[in-house]
């Protein structure tokens, strides 16, 4: 009795909890024959031995009973993190578990931090959305964040391999970014654990089953599209129940224990899903009707990372082009794998997954990645470019179709198809991706769009032809308020574009010289002599392939002037004929029959020297009267 009333005993509260199961007679007998100080020390040592014996001899049924809350969490959430389960740790005490919320909104059950170093590690992993690795790092003594930050490249990769993060380069990159933030501003990762961090300690006997159907959505401002009751995190395809109307906007101070439904009688501790409570559910299912179907993808893409993230419009564009190419591919069997690796078995499991499996798209993205795959030798700190992200997304969308999922085993055929999809979608390089990303947002506001009278969703995938009018409009949309130098440069760009298009059309015989009138220079006149000094005669024109009819390639302006000054042999000045009015901008210097030998560069039309030479040639070619 004296030992129980002694205030100096450090573990009095714990001793009262365990004394009911295995009381210690040694502590009571020793307290009667010794002094007050000896009684306190003896009772403390006896209590510690009781705790050690109880923790080592705990039956398996009690372990399963206490871990029911951790097993009741959705397996879809743990599969998204890709980390080992936190409830499988052998050193974790069921009484010290808490629910932690990652930065991307996922709930993870971890052990409660006990000191300042563990709090810093917890906050760093929470900032990187990697709380699933918290208990694994504690098992290996990784509670020193400074040691992780100061580790060299080989040592850091070895630690990542021991933790199980080496095969997930995106997780490694997020951890490195969080460590750099911790080094730059350590004040954000210090301080006691506050309730606003989304933590809730588990009861000593957590005979509760987490019910995602009756759990209202927590108030979140940074990620409004995330909802823990969505069907993307369900372990089985169970239709989601409507959210209660009274609990749609709960108070921030409501503990998590009120959001976990408790059964009325003791049941088997399995991760069962209870039916929704008819007393609290509302017959209006409008609170959950506007959730997107790809909630898991939005959660993963909102995590802090250095790799660019595609917008929904860009993903929709790539998906449309992938479906178009996928319909043209034959249905084949997956290639037989000869190696007995673990990835081979996992790949077969991914191919056998059903279309309703919430993990299917994430696993397809994992194994269909062309750049930065989990088993590649790419450096983790080297982020992917926007083009590489597009190629990876195109490969994933192409393998999403059950008819073309066999491409997961034929990466040599998947790579060129993915690049073709990106090219058809108009995402050939980063500049076109950024430009087309802004163009897609303007499509609903335009009446006709790129496809004339078609809807924006029916735009043809061959966007190279559709982007030509916008490019030409961008080149020729000069306002009168611009400077004369800008006007001159814009005119030269238009002239070169028209000349290049003309050569493309008339590179192969037979010709129709009457169609040359379609290519006219719009800004080839009304310029002063001062502006004509900005001539681009030294710049190279577009190189054209030499046709089979022996047409000469591009020649310098000096050679053209030498030819025009020589006596015309079989030259025909088409500008002096009756169709000269139609041929307003293009001047044919020399031609033999229907074959054009030399055409004046429209960019040099501003030069007075060339105009004088052409005037002399025109007067020499005209019949004498």
UniProtKB/Swiss-Prot annotation:
GO terms for biological process: locomotory behavior; negative regulation of DNA-templated transcription; neuroblast development; neuron development; regulation of DNA-templated transcription; wing disc pattern formation. It is found in: Nucleus. Residues 111-189 are annotated as: NCD1. Residues 224-234, 284-305, 558-568 have a biased composition (Polar residues). Induction: Regulated by vestigial (vg) in the wing. InterPro entries: NAB_co-repressor_dom, NAB_fam, Nab_N, NCD2_sf. Transcriptional regulator that can both act as a coactivator or a corepressor depending on the context. Lacks DNA-binding domains and acts by associating with other transcription factors such as rotund (rn) and squeeze (sqz). Acts as a coactivator of sqz and is required to limit the number of neurons that express the LIM-homeodomain gene apterous and to specify Tv neuronal fate. Acts as a corepressor of rn in wing development and is required to limit the expression of wingless (wg) in the wing hinge, where wg plays a mitogenic role. Belongs to the NAB family. This is NGFI-A-binding protein homolog. It comes from Drosophila melanogaster (Fruit fly).
């Amino acid at each position: 009795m004296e030992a129980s009333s002694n205030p100096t005993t450090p573990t009095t509260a714990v001793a009262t909890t365990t004394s009911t199961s295995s009381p210690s007679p040694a502590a009571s007998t020793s307290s009667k024959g010794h002094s007050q100080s000896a009684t306190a020390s003896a009772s403390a040592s006896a209590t510690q031995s009781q705790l050690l014996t109880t923790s080592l001899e705990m039956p398996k049924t009690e372990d399963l009973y206490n871990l029911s809350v951790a097993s009741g969490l959705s397996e879809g959430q743990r599969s998204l993190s890709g980390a080992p389960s936190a409830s499988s740790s052998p050193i974790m005490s069921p009484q010290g578990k808490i629910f932690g919320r990652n930065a991307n909104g996922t709930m993870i059950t971890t052990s409660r931090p006990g000191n300042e170093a563990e709090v810093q590690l917890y906050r760093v992993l929470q900032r990187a959305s990697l709380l699933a690795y918290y208990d694994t790092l504690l098992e290996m003594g990784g509670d020193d964040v400074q040691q992780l930050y100061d580790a060299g490249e080989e040592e850091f990769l070895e630690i990542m391999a021991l933790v199980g993060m080496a095969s997930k380069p995106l997780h490694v990159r997020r951890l490195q970014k969080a460590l750099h933030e911790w080094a730059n501003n350590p004040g954000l990762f210090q301080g006691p654990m506050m309730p606003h961090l989304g933590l809730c300690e588990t009861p000593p006997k957590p005979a509760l089953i987490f019910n995602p159907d009756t759990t209202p959505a927590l108030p979140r401002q940074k990620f409004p599209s995330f909802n823990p009751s969505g069907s993307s995190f369900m372990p089985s395809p169970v239709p989601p129940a409507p959210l209660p109307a009274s609990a749609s906007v709960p108070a921030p101070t409501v503990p998590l224990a009120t959001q976990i439904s408790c059964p009325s009688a003791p049941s088997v501790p399995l991760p069962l899903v209870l039916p929704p409570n008819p007393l609290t559910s509302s017959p209006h299912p409008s609170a959950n009707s506007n959730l997107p179907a790809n909630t898991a993808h939005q959660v993963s893409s909102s995590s802090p990372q250095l790799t660019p993230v595609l917008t929904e419009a860009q993903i929709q564009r790539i998906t449309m082009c992938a479906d178009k190419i996928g319909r043209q591919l034959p249905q084949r069997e997956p290639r037989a794998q000869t190696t007995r690796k673990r990835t081979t078995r996992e790949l077969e499991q991914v191919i056998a997954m059903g279309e309703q499996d919430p993990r299917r798209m994430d696993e397809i993205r994992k194994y269909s990645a062309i750049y930065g795959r989990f088993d590649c030798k790419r450096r983790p700190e080297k982020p992917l470019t926007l083009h590489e992200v597009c190629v990876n997304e195109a490969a994933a969308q192409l393998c999403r179709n059950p008819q073309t999922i066999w491409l997961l085993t034929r990466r040599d055929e998947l790579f060129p198809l993915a690049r073709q999809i990106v090219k058809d979608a108009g995402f050939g390089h980063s500049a076109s991706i950024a430009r087309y990303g802004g163009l897609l947002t303007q499509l609903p506001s335009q009446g006709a769009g790129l496809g004339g009278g078609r809807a924006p969703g029916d735009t043809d995938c061959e966007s190279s032809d559709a982007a030509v009018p916008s490019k030409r409009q961008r080149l020729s949309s000069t306002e009168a308020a611009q400077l004369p130098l800008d006007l001159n440069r814009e005119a030269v760009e238009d002239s070169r574009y028209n000349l290049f298009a003309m050569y493309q059309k008339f590179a192969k015989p037979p010709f129709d010289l009457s169609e040359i009138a379609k290519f006219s220079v719009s800004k080839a006149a009304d310029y002063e002599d001062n502006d004509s000094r900005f001539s681009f005669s030294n710049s190279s024109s577009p190189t054209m392939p030499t046709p089979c009819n022996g047409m000469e390639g591009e020649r310098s302006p000096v050679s053209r002037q030498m030819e025009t000054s020589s006596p015309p042999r079989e030259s025909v000045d088409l500008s002096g004929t009756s169709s000269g009015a139609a041929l307003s901008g293009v001047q044919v210097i020399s031609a033999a029959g229907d074959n054009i030998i030399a055409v004046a560069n429209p960019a040099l039309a501003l030069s007075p020297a060339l105009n004088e030479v052409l005037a002399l040639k025109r007067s020499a070619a005209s019949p004498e009267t």
